[in-house]
Amino acid sequence: MPLYSGDKISIGKFVIGNPMPIVVTSVFYEDVSTFVERLQTKVLSDKNLYEIRFDMFTEREISDEEELISAMREMDIDYIFTYRGKDARKYYETAIRKMAPAVDIDMDLIGKLEAKPTVTKVIGSYHTSDSEAMMSALDRMIDSDVDMVKVACSYSEDQEFLGDLKRIIDIRKNRRKPIAYVPMGRTFWRALAGYYVSDIVYAMADRPTAYGQPPADYYYQAFKALFY
């Protein structure tokens, strides 16, 4: 596990808090059928934990979301459902009612969804380029009732990132809620955050869904060098 880790939680079959951070493969496609076909033909592994960026799909009606959730359940594939942007609430309500393994919701939606998760794990998240705003959001979400917290911040300088990494390490020493810390800017920063504090890290599949996102193999090689 990271040098400073949180309590264990499960997202489907995946236990967050194992010996190394879980590598989550972040994906989006034109439509659900394209994604499902790639899984069925083994272009994409059915052994991964996926983040499905449904807001980046071209075809993304509620009916498409329901088709996606049903297909993933039939294939027994675990995932984090993510939707950024307009009408996010209705997509998350659907995901929770249909018992998706996990959802990644913006901090502003915490406590505002009518559907109450019984199976679905809730990850509260906040994205910014303001370091102080990120730290404030981290404190607020750790104190909320979400299962896990994700904060992402854009950096241009090493010292900015290293300063925040130290502050998050200090927080992790006393507070046990699982955390994903995503420093956007340089790819190695993501691996370093995984080594020290992040219980999960995000990798690209065919193409990145966020700035500086590497393929999964990058993390495996970095962690091999750092952990052993």
From Swiss-Prot:
Pfam families, A to Z: DHquinase_I
Presence of keyword Transport: no
The protein's Enzyme Commission number: 4.2.1.10
Binding residues annotated for 3-dehydroquinate, in chain numbering: S26, E51, I52, R53, R84, R190, T209, Q213
Positions of disulphide bridges: none
GO function term, MF aspect, one: 3-dehydroquinate dehydratase activity
Domain of life of the source: Archaea
Gene Ontology biological process: 3,4-dihydroxybenzoate biosynthetic process; amino acid biosynthetic process; aromatic amino acid family biosynthetic process; chorismate biosynthetic process
Record pathway: Metabolic intermediate biosynthesis; chorismate biosynthesis; chorismate from D-erythrose 4-phosphate and phosphoenolpyruvate: step 3/7
Active site: H127, K150
Catalytic activity: 3-dehydroquinate = 3-dehydroshikimate + H2O
UniProt cross-references to SUPFAM superfamilies, sorted A to Z: Aldolase
UniProt keywords, alphabetically: Amino-acid biosynthesis, Aromatic amino acid biosynthesis, Lyase, Schiff base
Record-linked InterPro entries: Aldolase_TIM, DHquinase_I, Type-I_3-dehydroquinase
EC category: lyase
Keyword Amino-acid biosynthesis: yes
Subunit architecture: Homodimer.
Protein family membership: Belongs to the type-I 3-dehydroquinase family.
Role noted for this protein: Involved in the third step of the chorismate pathway, which leads to the biosynthesis of aromatic amino acids. Catalyzes the cis-dehydration of 3-dehydroquinate (DHQ) and introduces the first double bond of the aromatic ring to yield 3-dehydroshikimate.
Protein name from the UniProt record: 3-dehydroquinate dehydratase
